[in-house]
């Protein structure tokens, strides 16, 4: 017999129970460190919008001119960093709040599966994918926000569930995806940004988890190649953004 915290247990009973050890990042309901850092960066950039650009609680004029994706400024002014800064700036506090709430909910679920480094790489790939989609569909528009990256997380979550044999209907993501599809088609947001991020999330989901429950991850058990593939994806998408931005003049006509 073995002494337990309450009474005693027989050896056969204790041998059947495997002890689970939870860490800060694997504790159910906990928020991963990378998710917290990304939320902090978004909040910091929003604060800078007030300090540097005199933005009001909902003003988007000066902020958009300085941070947002725009083909003319990226291509003609050489402001390539907009591909990245556009994913951290927001059009007002409501826009910021919606995206950060989504990141707070979705981020930890995926981060616990991928780990903080791979999760951050995937997030940035989806962010740049969103910039590519936005510039591809409308290179003259001023677009910004974390929505592209958030849609990338949705794509990753879809594939993560599929790898576990859980369909969209079973996972509860169906209504969420339909709602976001409706929002994307409403004309008030960047359809290209949402679609670009989501497609990147789906592709990375195949790399990390496999296409479905019967498929292995693209690189099997290799722990290095998926990260290299994600980094290459970011570079390719960034170059794609530069190309898409260069189309601004043709969009004028």
What are the language-model segments listed below?
Residues 1-253:
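A detector for small-residue-rich transmembrane helices and their helix-helix packing motifs
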């Amino acid at each position: 017999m073995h002494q337990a915290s309450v009474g005693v247990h027989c050896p056969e009973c204790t041998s059947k129970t495997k002890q689970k050890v939870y860490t800060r990042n694997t504790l159910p309901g906990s928020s991963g460190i990378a998710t917290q850092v990304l939320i902090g960066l978004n909040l910091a950039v929003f604060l800078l919008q007030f300090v540097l650009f005199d933005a009001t609680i909902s003003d988007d004029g000066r902020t958009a001119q300085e941070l947002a994706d725009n083909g003319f400024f990226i291509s003609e002014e050489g402001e390539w960093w907009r591909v990245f800064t556009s994913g951290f700036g927001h059009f007002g506090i409501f826009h910021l709040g919606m995206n950060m709430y989504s990141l707070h909910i979705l981020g930890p679920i995926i981060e616990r599966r991928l780990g903080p480094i791979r999760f951050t790489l995937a997030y940035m790939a989806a962010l740049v994918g969103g910039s590519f989609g936005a510039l591809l569909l409308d290179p003259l528009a001023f677009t910004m926000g974390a929505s592209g990256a958030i849609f990338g997380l949705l794509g990753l979550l879809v594939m993560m569930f599929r790898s576990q044999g859980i369909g969209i209907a079973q996972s509860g993501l169906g209504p969420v995806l339909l709602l976001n599809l409706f929002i994307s088609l409403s004309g008030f947001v960047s359809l290209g940004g949402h679609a670009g991020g989501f497609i990147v999330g789906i592709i990375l989901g195949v790399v990390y988890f496999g296409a479905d429950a019967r498929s292995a991850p693209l690189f099997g058990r290799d722990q290095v190649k998926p990260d290299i593939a994600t980094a290459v994806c970011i570079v390719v998408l960034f170059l794609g953004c530069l190309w898409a931005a260069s189309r601004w003049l043709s969009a004028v006509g």
